[in-house]
């Protein structure tokens, strides 16, 4: 898939979504529109993004992958929690090996996708921490609940032999090499536009392991049904843990705000294009090109 094809698909779906935006409507109407369209467009666009990335950069990343060996132990760990046989595995494994070769890799999988992951890893399986954390197939909602519980559990963090971890979801990727300098503070993720002063979160988050264990073992009354990143963010604020400035965080990760510079990591930006306030197709193409161009 070439860039022009990707843009045509993106722009068509973007216009479809904006065409049904409830202008001059109540906050409730806008919320209903968002709930009705956001997940649909996220699912529609994601396969095209990764198809383009694999087509454009797959060969170069695969060449690096062939020579790469994950360190069994490092101060910095990449951590993936994923129980599915996800279609993005091939690209993501090569992307992280290229972007952060000094990091160890922990994959918390299930007994249903462990064998598939071993085949993807091939001769690298012996140097990757592949941990069957989940059992069986569950519904999407139940899977989300179990994942949130995992990140609120001290025992989970105690299994990661590192000072820092970078949590990495299956709809994320790195545009640039990951410098060790991003591993600072106790917790942060992509800035959230509606609460920019908070630690943020999303599919890419940096976490200091000792701080996560401390938080999970502190006040158990903090636990609530919210997403794990919001839950940890609340504890970070409550107990006065360290968070980098929003200026720093904006240069590291991007999720739901327009880019002011090229970030290091991306999390499903295609879901939040409405937030970018794009006025014309030329500007649209410029932003999309920025967010799908890897420094390979």
Regions inferred by a protein language model and the residue ranges of each:
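N-proximal low-complexity "stem/linker" segments adjacent to membrane-targeting elements
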Residues: 3-94
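Short beta-strand/turn micro-motifs composed of small residues
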Residues: 80-82, 107-111, 189
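Short, solvent-exposed loop/turn segments at secondary-structure junctions
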Residues: 83-86, 111-114, 134-136, 171-174, ...
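Short, acidic, metal-binding catalytic loop of nucleotide-sugar glycosyltransferases
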Residues: 94-103
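Active-site-proximal specificity loops/subdomain of glycosyltransferases
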Residues: 108-163
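Short glycine-/acidic-enriched loop or helix-start segments at secondary-structure transitions
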Residues: 117-118, 175-179, 216
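GT-A fold catalytic core of metal-dependent nucleotide-sugar glycosyltransferases
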Residues: 153-193
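Catalytic core and acceptor-binding pocket of nucleotide-sugar-dependent glycosyltransferases
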Residues: 199-296
């Amino acid at each position: 898939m070439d860039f022009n094809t990707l843009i045509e698909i993106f722009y068509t779906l973007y216009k479809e979504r904006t065409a049904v935006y409830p202008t001059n409507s109540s906050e409730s109407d806008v919320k209903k529109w968002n709930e009705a369209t956001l997940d649909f467009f996220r699912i529609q666009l994601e396969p095209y993004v990764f198809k383009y990335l694999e087509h454009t950069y797959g060969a170069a990343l695969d060449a690096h992958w062939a020579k790469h060996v994950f360190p069994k132990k490092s101060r910095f760990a990449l951590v993936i929690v994923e129980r599915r046989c996800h279609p993005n595995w091939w690209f993501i494994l090569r992307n992280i090996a290229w972007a952060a070769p000094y990091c160890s890799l922990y994959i918390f999988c299930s007994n249903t996708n462990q064998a598939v992951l071993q085949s993807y890893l091939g001769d690298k399986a012996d140097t990757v921490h592949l941990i069957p954390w989940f059992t069986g197939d569950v519904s999407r909602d139940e899977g989300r609940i179990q994942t949130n519980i995992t990140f609120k559990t001290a025992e989970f963090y105690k299994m990661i032999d590192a000072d820092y971890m970078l949590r990495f979801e299956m709809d994320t990727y790195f545009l640039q090499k990951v410098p060790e300098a991003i591993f600072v503070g106790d917790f942060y993720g992509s800035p959230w536009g509606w609460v920019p002063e908070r630690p943020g979160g999303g599919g890419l988050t940096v976490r200091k392991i000792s701080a996560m264990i401390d938080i999970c073992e502190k006040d158990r009354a903090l636990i609530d049904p919210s997403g794990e990143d919001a839950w940890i963010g609340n504890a970070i604020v409550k107990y006065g843990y360290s968070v980098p400035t929003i200026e720093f965080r904006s240069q590291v990760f991007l999720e739901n705000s327009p880019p002011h510079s090229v970030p290091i990591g991306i999390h499903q930006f295609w879901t939040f294009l409405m937030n970018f306030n794009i006025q014309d197709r030329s500007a649209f193409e410029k932003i999309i090109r920025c967010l799908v161009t890897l420094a390979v």
